[in-house]
Amino acid sequence: MTDETAANGENEAGRQSQSSSLPLVVNAQYVKDFSFENPNAPQSLMADQGQPKIDLQVDVQARGLNDTVSEVVLSMRAEATRNDRTAFIVELSYAGIFTLPAQIQPEQARAILLIEAPRLLFPFARQIVAEATQNGGYPPLMLQPLDFVDLYRRQVLNRGSNGEVGHA
């Protein structure tokens, strides 16, 4: 009976773990669009020019592909300037295909797709940006983690919550 009790306890723990996990399946991740511009090279690569000012813009979009599958696109644009001259511009749209359970409510699906999905995509997008800037002759641009909850809240306040999956 001890073995049976232990097995039942393990099964119960497994069910609890599964029920508390995020109801999001990552089907694919990919670079949707990518650009690196180094408009003032080689002058911008000369030493002793000081740290560049980085302007970072981030957007998240989601669109349904069918009832349970959606594409989420994390778009980033970073422009580095020194002395009012552009050092580099990197633009990346990094996407993922995600599946949610059919019974999930639309507002919950919207929040998951615009908060949790980009949170999963971000480390990969960050690595691509870092490698691109390094390959462009600069130190790697290491983006700090982003607050996708705050980005989502601002989107809801700015555009209103109409229940459709969209931008954050």
From Swiss-Prot:
Pfam families: SecB. The keyword Amino-acid biosynthesis does not apply. Homotetramer, a dimer of dimers. One homotetramer interacts with 1 SecA dimer. The keyword DNA-binding does not apply. NCBIfam families: PRK05751.1-3, secB. Belongs to the SecB family. This is Protein-export protein SecB. Its main location: cytoplasm.
